[in-house]
Amino acid sequence: MSGRRDDAAMPNQPVASEHPAVPAATPQQTHPPRLNAAEPHPSGFAIIGSKIGPAAPARSILARPRLVEWFEQHTRSRLIILSAEAGYGKTTLLGEFSTHTRDRVVWYRLERSDGDWITFLSYLVAGLRDVWPGFGRRTEALLRNVAAMGSSREVVLAQFLSDLSSAEAGRVAVILDDYHLVDASPDVRMIVSRMLERAPEGMYLVLSGRGTPTLSVGRLRGQGRVQKLSIDDLRFTLPEIEKLFATTYGQPLDSDACQVVAER
């Protein structure tokens, strides 16, 4: 179940194993979400604050500094992809990264209903407003008028990209968690593609999900600006297995036993 590697060689290459990483602890909010319930949004539906707040593990099973370091080394890329099935600790790793990075982070937890372009753009505006207060007022106004005045998707997206281009400079990571739930939406794919092409230079996207996103990124890949972590990278290395059992489970294993765990 290994994916094709698009990134530079990883340090401390993980052992080959088909056994997934030990399930990680569920991330918790690092600060109270902006909303405890749904907040009315000008586009006509409610924004759920817990879907767009940064998160980090309250209690990780095991810190993974080699992967956090890998992230830090690749934040100058335009697109970072995390691709693995459930249970490999993708969200926990993103939480650990978000607490270590100096970059500002927008974290959007996706559901299938977010495949609607109005919903998707509305949440992006709300998330980016946590980074840039007052962001996207003109985009919001157009979203509000989609039904009343028939604002087209292209007009709204053009305004959104214009708002992005005029935003305050700085390093910003936009995390789209569980991206596989909306990857089938042509509208979402188009919006993400335009963001990759037109967003400010300091902004990069992190797509985390099951499988490789359906995006045309050949030009960016040719420029070395697409990086990927797959199942092989997310598996525990032998030293990580040894530390996990010794420090978390209180059951130290010898090297042979660690190898058995890795090969299960």
Predicted stretch roles:
Residues 79:
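Walker A (P-loop) ATP-phosphate-binding motif of ABC ATPase nucleotide-binding domains
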Residues 177-178:
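Walker B catalytic acidic pair
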Residues 86-88, 92-172, 181-183, 228, ...:
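Conserved phosphate-binding/catalytic loops and adjacent sensor/switch elements of nucleotide-binding enzymes
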Residues 75-76, 168-170, 199-202:
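Short loop/turn elements that form and flank the Walker-type P-loop nucleotide-binding site
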